[in-house]
Every structure is written in structure tokens, then in C-alpha cells.
UniProtKB/Swiss-Prot annotation:
One of its GO terms (biological process) is glycerophospholipid metabolic process. Its EC number is 1.1.1.94. It comes from the Bacteria. It comes from Streptococcus equi subsp. zooepidemicus (strain H70). Belongs to the NAD-dependent glycerol-3-phosphate dehydrogenase family. This is Glycerol-3-phosphate dehydrogenase [NAD(P)+]. Catalyzes the reduction of the glycolytic intermediate dihydroxyacetone phosphate (DHAP) to sn-glycerol 3-phosphate (G3P), the key precursor for phospholipid synthesis. It is found in: Cytoplasm.
């Protein structure tokens, strides 16, 4: 692929790791953020120490506070900002962007106020004449591993397979590989909802339960993620792929996962406000729990794990009692997808 200019909106851990992947592939990368000290550190010291204490970035990776500068002549734009500000940033992009570009996002969540997926927000806020069909970049990926060039395989999903293949070629190299998918609903709901299950798996660890219990929550968590996704129009097969079970495994079993760590802290009895303060990073699974619970209630979808986490976080229920309460739920068949 010829050299591309890529604007990455959001110099957090994942945005920074993806900037390095693109730089390794010979592309021109511009990171945009709104914290002057961070932008200055990236440009002068070539580090992003809030997220990676011992990583030195290539000097070719540039950062800016100026959105217009970041977007100038960009062939592709990658949103990697927290879910709650995606719409705001998309509005800003729409005001500044003066040419058509491939628009991607690599965030995982659902908008709290509208319950919308992030690709829908980008479609609504960025005029069609200024963008491709949205491409979702999602899958099992810890930034801490990608930044040291550990092997990572994820998904590029779009309603337009040509756009998905462009992103596949843009990112793929000897340690980072993308597979294409056209099931945007499935890929986005998998990426968002697995954070809830990761909180639950972490909570079990914090409560002192063993691998049997964690495996149960992850597996039955996948079942309820699939249940809701299919209700929203997704292909159930998507949840057996990288963006589904793959992401659930990596997020639901690892100390790298901020959602798992938050759940573990909740299981130990720590207060949510203290957990969020100590972590210093967005815990998407907390807000997504509320959104998913509300959608499930509205659509009549059975999501017992999500309900248990919701009641613990938002209604003050004891997390151990909430989880153990699921053991007395009605008996059900395991496989819901027989034809």
C-alpha cells in the first residue's frame, strides 16, 4: 500500500499503540489530543508516560492540539476517544474536515444517552460526502502488548467491504493482522458488551472464586451478549470470532484489562469512585452496563449477568449476593441457536 496520512483522534493507550503500528507500516501519523502536557511530551520526549512508562515512540509520530492540522490532507481518520465524547468530537471533525476520508473507530462502548453504537453516531454527525462507510476496528487487543509488537489479530468491519479491506491493508504487518467482516452490529456490540462480562469475571476473582466460576461467567456471558446482539440484528456467528469470543477471553481473563481490574476491586469491596480515581483511565464497562441493562429491559432480552452487575453498581446490591443469586435462576437449555 502507498504511504497514507492518518489522523488518530485520541492519544490514549490504544490510540498510541495503533499510531506505532501505522508508523511501522510507513504511514504518516498525526495524533490529536487536548492535553497540552501530553502533546508536548509526545513531540519532544517521544513518550506517552501516563500509559507507557518505558516505551519510546518513533520520532516520526507527531502530535497536535490543532484538529485542523491533524486532519489536513488525511487519507484516513481513526477515532479512539471515550464513548461519551465521540459525538462531540465527530461534530468538531465535521466542521473542520474539507475533503473525503476513510473514517474508522477503535472504541468500544454504547452512547449512554441514546444507546447508539459508535458507527451510527459517526454516520449521523459526519456528512456522507466527507467519509467512507464507517469501519470498526475491534478485537482481542491489549495496548500494552501491541505497543511492544506482540502478535495481535483483530477485525475490520464495515458495511462496505472495500473500506474494510482498505483498513485491513493499512494496518496489517508481521505482528498485527486484521480480518474483514461486514457484520458491523455484531462486531460493535461484541466489543462493547464484553466489557460488562469482564467486570463480572474480575468481580469473581476479587471475591475469591476459582477458574470454574470465571469460565462459567465468560461462557454464559457470551450467550447473553449474543442474545442481545441477535435481537439488534447481528449474525450469531460473529460472536464466535475475534471480536466476540476472542475479545471476551482477552478482556475477561487478564490483569491488563481495566474492566477486569475494576471488577476485581469491586469484588474486594472497594468503592466505584475510588476505583475510577485510582485507575486514571476510562472504564467503559461501567457505563455500558447501564446502557445494556436498559436495552435488555426495553427489548425483553434475558441478560442475568448484566442485570447482576447493574444492580451491584447502580442499585447498591451486594455483588456477591447478586452473583450467587444467578445460581437459583430458572433452568435453561445451553444452546439457543439450533435451527
Amino acid at each position: 500500500m502507498p504511504k497514507q496520512k492518518v489522523a488518530i483522534l485520541g492519544p490514549g493507550s490504544w490510540g498510541t499503540a495503533l499510531a506505532q503500528v501505522l508508523n511501522d507500516n510507513g504511514h504518516e501519523v498525526r495524533l490529536w489530543g487536548n492535553i497540552p502536557e501530553q502533546i508536548n511530551e509526545i513531540n519532544t520526549r517521544h513518550t506517552n508516560s501516563h500509559y507507557f512508562k518505558d516505551i519510546v515512540l518513533d520520532e516520526a509520530i507527531k502530535a497536535t492540539l490543532d484538529l485542523k492540522e491533524a486532519l489536513a490532507d488525511a487519507d484516513a481518520i481513526l477515532f479512539v476517544v471515550p464513548t461519551k465524547v465521540t459525538r462531540l468530537v465527530a461534530k468538531q471533525v465535521a466542521q473542520v474536515l474539507d475533503h473525503k476520508a476513510v473514517v474508522m473507530h477503535a472504541s468500544k462502548g454504547l452512547e449512554p444517552e441514546t444507546h447508539e453504537r459508535l458507527s451510527t453516531i459517526l454516520e449521523e454527525e459526519i456528512p456522507a460526502q466527507l467519509r467512507s462507510e464507517i469501519v470498526v476496528v475491534s478485537g482481542p487487543s491489549h495496548a500494552e502488548e501491541t505497543i511492544v509488537r506482540d502478535i495481535t489479530l483483530i477485525t475490520a468491519a464495515s458495511k462496505d467491504i472495500t473500506a474494510a479491506k482498505y483498513v485491513q491493508a493499512l494496518f496489517s504487518n508481521h505482528y498485527f493482522r486484521l480480518y474483514t467482516n461486514t457484520d458491523v452490529i455484531g462486531v460493535e456490540t461484541a466489543g462493547a458488551l464484553k466489557n460488562i462480562i469482564a467486570v463480572g469475571a474480575g468481580a469473581l476473582h476479587g471475591l475469591g472464586y476459582g477458574d470454574n466460576a470465571k469460565a462459567a461467567v465468560i461462557t454464559r456471558g457470551l450467550a447473553e451478549i449474543t442474545r442481545l446482539g441477535v435481537k439488534l440484528g447481528a449474525d450469531p456467528l460473529t460472536y464466535s470470532g475475534l471480536s466476540g469470543v476472542g475479545d471476551l477471553i482477552v478482556t475477561g481473563t487478564s490483569v491488563h484489562s481495566r474492566n477486569w481490574r475494576a471488577g476485581a476491586a469491586l469484588g474486594r469491596g472497594e468503592k466505584l469512585k475510588d476505583i475510577e480515581s485510582n485507575m486514571g483511565m476510562v472504564i467503559e464497562g461501567i457505563s455500558t452496563t447501564k446502557v445494556a441493562y436498559e436495552i435488555a429491559q426495553e427489548l425483553g432480552v434475558y441478560m442475568p449477568i448484566t442485570s447482576a452487575i447493574y444492580k451491584s453498581i447502580y442499585e447498591g446490591a451486594d455483588i456477591k449476593e447478586s452473583i450467587l443469586g444467578m445460581m437459583s435462576n430458572e433452568f435453561r437449555s445451553e444452546n439457543e441457536w439450533h435451527s
